[in-house]
Curated annotation (Swiss-Prot):
GO terms for molecular function: ATP binding; proton-transporting ATP synthase activity, rotational mechanism; proton-transporting ATPase activity, rotational mechanism. One of its GO terms (biological process) is proton motive force-driven plasma membrane ATP synthesis. It is found in: Cell membrane. It is a peripheral membrane protein. Component of the A-type ATP synthase that produces ATP from ADP in the presence of a proton gradient across the membrane. It comes from Methanococcus maripaludis (strain C7 / ATCC BAA-1331). Belongs to the V-ATPase F subunit family. This is A-type ATP synthase subunit F.
Length: 99
């Protein structure tokens, strides 16, 4: 199983330095969607990493992907969401609101 990465130049450089080869540097949502589709059609790819911002821009494309997709923060940090599902799960399980 190989890992594919789709991201902006600042994100992909770290993954290239880590030795990943299936890395797509994109500058538009259209390029990102095309790269995600290419990785999804590659049978050797088992995990696709992209940024949260790209994930928000191409949510429909990502929803159709059959592989595991992980969205990581970019250089601007994580996207703050009103109803973060992870926060809700932690609050319900532990009884503590994380900030």
């Amino acid at each position: 199983m190989r890992i594919g990465v789709v991201g902006d130049p600042d994100v992909v450089v770290g993954f290239r330095l880590a030795g990943l080869t299936d890395v797509y540097e994109v500058k538009s949502p259209e390029q990102a969607a095309k790269a995600i589709e290419e990785l999804n059609s590659n049978s050797e790819i088992g995990l696709i990493i992209t940024t949260e911002r790209i994930g928000e821009e191409i949510r429909d494309t990502i929803s159709g992907v059959k592989k595991v997709v992980v969205e990581v923060p970019d250089k601007n940090g994580p996207i703050v969401r009103e109803n973060d599902p992870v926060k809700v799960l932690v609050r319900n399980a532990v009884g503590v609101d994380i900030k």
